[in-house]
């Protein structure tokens, strides 16, 4: 090769330099790439090791949840109110259906027929081939799940899966629905005790993790497996007594029907000494096993109103919320004259009145700061009256005077003491208070601020509050405060949970009665009890006499408060109520009944005395014997009391006549024999004293029916005679004190209905037309 003048090969120098530069750049790039790769490997293997390991495991293993058994809810005597049982969840794996080329139409068709799920819905889910988990049906009962297993086995379908779950059952349906509450599809509590104590009842779920194949199926010999056992939830025993709850629901439901109640009803039965709730009812009710379904009446009303599907859904959701709402703790209302118990207690405690005090009611009175005279409910007034009579008459004017004797500042202090105001709370909350009952959804009271209420130049708020108006409280607040008035003066915190037990039955916690404070003295409480007993026991003066039960000493107070005026008809809406306690000399229980908007077309005067008091009387008549409270009859009660028909079939006529005479009953013989072969009414029936029992001698009663007469307005004695002439019998649901004076206000079988001979008709009595005016 020719060389240049300097002896070098032409072009050699620049080429070599280019080579060196290229090698250098390649080295730098190689080192840089190595460093990047090393950094990335460090990031993956060191920094993100745990993350990628978890991801790898997630691809190689499948986790199955082991559901915890939710704790059982019992009543105070061990009756099961809520329980869980094993069910299954059926789901499909669209990815596996695709992988194994399974017939998704056949799968969708078969599951639809077995589970009752829409075919198109299942088919659409089966088409989501990127998914390994699509739920077809939850809470599937074992017998149905077994059909799915057979369908899966026969078809050899890998893509159909079944996993264990639990379902909540409520053996008593709607009993104590608002107290117990319910759970959702995921077994999370959504209302009542189920929600308030969800963390206690739910326990902790476990899991099983197993190695899987690329197809997502379990490996025969798992190289990876982990198991964490579930911890079952704890169980709860309530203070609720299922028997008492049933009594209260039965009579409250009947009242809603009898008085055509438009906006539901509520009732509470409480142990006065402890605050334990024996029964809490809110109507309308619903079945806990089907809590999303509203009543047929509500559905029909919504259907008649809704103009579109969207509006229907909105109205349906509102109806659900309304039926789930617990009126006993969530609704506030003006208590009306039932609050006079509180005014009475504070006045007696302060010594500004005594049982010897007297008052005059002219029908109205002027109040400082009020533009118009304040009227009593009784037109023309009650005239002169003692303190006891003022309470019996439920006189508004007398109680305005009593409130003024107490004074606005002391009245406000006692309102706080009885739990209606909380001045220790934040400023934004100082006009309200709650009892703190262990149940979600409790509302607070609504009270005047202290500066407005305690204005000495305007006593209108004090005047209205003295007889239970211009403020709102909840039913649970009222019964708690009234219990304090009659139990010796102790304000107790109401509660529903008696104890919590683990899955082995060991008691974890026990609720002890909690004294909030003593509000009045035992002496004052005794005076309150004595006066309130006269409201029920005095059949001529007391507005609460319809709560009377023969043989039992019951005290109480009526209440009737106005809500609003209906826009179309202009009619007023009322809440009528009655709160009673028994035995009056040593109270064990208190019962509050509240009826929201009774109909004026029911035939009964709208008032607490005429509507709510009889309901409480019927509840007391069932509950007190159940609690072991023995009746103590006066001579007059024994003479007027209804009689139980003895068994005389098989006796000679002479023996039968003697047995019936001893029972306070008469008889008439039908037939020519010497031995009683049958009788009407049957043994065990309770009928009016002196009623005529039919004795059949040698023959049996011939089936016969009569048309039920209208007994309303008749005296008890006249009703007995009217029914007796038809071969029917009468008994008084709320007891008899004077068969000539007491009048029938309601009957168990409606007029015009057919009724068989020998049937016993239960009637409700009130004293007379004059006493019927004692409505508040």
Predicted regions and their residues:
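Flexible glycine-/small-residue-rich
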Residues: 92-94, 164, 181-184, 271, ...
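Beta-lactam-recognizing serine transpeptidase/beta-lactamase-like catalytic domain environment
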Residues: 3, 82, 88, 214-227, ...
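Periplasmic/cell-envelope proteins involved in peptidoglycan metabolism and beta-lactam response
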Residues: 1-306, 323, 332, 409-417, ...
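Extracytoplasmic
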Residues: 66-69, 76, 84-87, 131, ...
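Short, solvent-exposed alpha-helical surface patches in non-cytosolic proteins
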Residues: 176-178, 276, 341-342, 479-482, ...
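Acidic/histidine-enriched alpha-helical segments
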Residues: 121-131, 167, 261-274, 360-364, ...
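Ligand-recognition elements built from short beta-strands and adjacent flexible loops
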Residues: 511, 551, 565, 593-776
């Amino acid at each position: 090769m020719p060389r240049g003048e300097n002896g070098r090969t032409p072009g050699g120098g620049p080429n070599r330099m280019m080579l060196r530069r290229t090698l250098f750049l390649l080295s730098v790039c190689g080192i840089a790439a190595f460093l990047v790769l090393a950094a990335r490997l460090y990031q993956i293997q060191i920094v993100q090791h745990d993350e990628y390991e978890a991801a790898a495991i997630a691809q190689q293993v499948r986790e199955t949840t082991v559901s915890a058994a939710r704790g059982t809810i019992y009543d105070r005597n061990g009756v099961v109110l809520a329980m869980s049982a094993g069910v299954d969840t059926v789901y499909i794996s669209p990815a596996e259906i695709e992988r194994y080329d399974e017939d998704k139409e056949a799968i969708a068709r078969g599951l639809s027929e077995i589970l009752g799920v829409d075919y198109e819905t299942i088919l659409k889910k089966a088409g989501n081939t990127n998914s390994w988990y699509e739920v077809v049906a939850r809470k599937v009962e074992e017998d149905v799940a077994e059909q799915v297993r057979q369908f899966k086995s026969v078809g050899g379908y890998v893509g159909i899966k079944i996993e264990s779950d639990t379902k909540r059952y409520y053996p008593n349906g709607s009993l104590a629905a608002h107290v117990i509450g319910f759970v959702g599809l995921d077994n999370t509590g959504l209302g009542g005790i189920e929600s308030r104590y969800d963390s206690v009842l739910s326990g902790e779920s476990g899991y099983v993790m197993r190695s899987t194949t690329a197809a997502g199926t379990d490996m025969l010999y798992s190289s990876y497996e982990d198991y964490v056992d579930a911890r079952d939830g704890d169980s709860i025993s309530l203070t609720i007594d299922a028997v008492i709850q049933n009594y209260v629901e039965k009579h409250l439901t009947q009242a809603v029907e009898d008085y055509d109640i438009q906006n539901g009803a509520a009732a509470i039965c409480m142990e006065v000494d402890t605050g334990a709730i024996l029964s809490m009812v809110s109507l309308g009710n619903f079945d806990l096993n089907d809590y999303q379904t509203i009543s047929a009446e509500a559905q029909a009303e919504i259907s008649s109103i809704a103009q579109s599907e969207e509006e229907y859904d909105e109205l349906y959701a509102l109806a659900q919320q309304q039926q789930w709402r617990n009126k006993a703790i969530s609704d506030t209302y003006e208590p009306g004259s039932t609050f006079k118990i509180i005014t009475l207690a504070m006045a007696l405690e302060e010594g500004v009145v005594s049982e010897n005090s007297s008052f005059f009611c002219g029908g109205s009175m002027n109040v400082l700061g009020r533009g118009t005279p304040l009227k009593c409910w009784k037109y023309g007034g009650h005239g002169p009256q003692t303190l006891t009579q003022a309470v019996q008459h439920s006189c508004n004017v007398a109680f305005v005077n009593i409130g003024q004797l107490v004074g606005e500042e002391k009245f406000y202090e006692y309102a706080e003491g009885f739990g209606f105001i909380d001045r220790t709370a934040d400023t934004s909350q100082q006009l309200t208070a709650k009892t703190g009952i262990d149940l979600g959804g409790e509302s607070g009271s609504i009270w005047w601020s202290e500066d407005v209420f305690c204005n000495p130049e305007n006593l209108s708020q004090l005047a209205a509050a003295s007889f239970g108006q211009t403020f709102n409280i909840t039913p649970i607040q009222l019964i708690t405060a009234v219990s304090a008035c009659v139990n010796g003066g102790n304000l107790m915190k109401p509660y529903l949970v008696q104890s919590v037990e683990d899955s082995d039955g060991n008691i974890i916690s026990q609720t002890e009665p909690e004294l909030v404070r003593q509000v009045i003295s035992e002496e004052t409480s005794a005076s309150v009890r004595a006066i309130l007993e006269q409201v029920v026991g005095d059949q001529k003066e007391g507005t609460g006499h319809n709560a009377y039960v023969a043989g039992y000493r019951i005290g109480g107070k009526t209440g009737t408060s106005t809500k609003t005026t209906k826009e179309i008809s202009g009619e007023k809406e009322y809440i009528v109520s009655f709160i009673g306690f028994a035995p009056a000399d040593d109270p064990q229980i208190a019962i509050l009944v509240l009826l929201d908007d009774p109909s004026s077309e029911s035939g009964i005067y709208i008032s607490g005395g005429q509507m709510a008091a009889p309901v409480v009387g019927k509840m007391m008549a069932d509950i007190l014997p159940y609690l072991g409270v023995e009746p103590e009859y006066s001579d007059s009660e024994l003479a007027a009391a209804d009689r139980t028909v003895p068994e005389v079939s098989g006796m000679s006529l002479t023996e039968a006549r003697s047995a019936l005479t001893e029972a306070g009953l008469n008889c008439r013989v039908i037939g020519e024999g010497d031995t009683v072969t049958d009788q009407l009414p049957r043994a065990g029936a309770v009928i009016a004293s002196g009623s005529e029992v039919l004795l059949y001698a040698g023959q049996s009663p011939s089936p016969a029916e009569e048309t039920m007469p209208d007994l309303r307005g008749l005296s008890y004695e006249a009703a007995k005679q009217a029914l007796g002439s038809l071969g029917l019998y009468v008994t008084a649901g709320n007891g008899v004190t004077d068969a000539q004076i007491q009048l029938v206000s309601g009957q168990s079988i409606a007029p015009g209905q057919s009724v068989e001979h020998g049937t016993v008709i239960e009637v409700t009595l009130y004293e007379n037309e004059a006493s019927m005016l004692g409505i508040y």
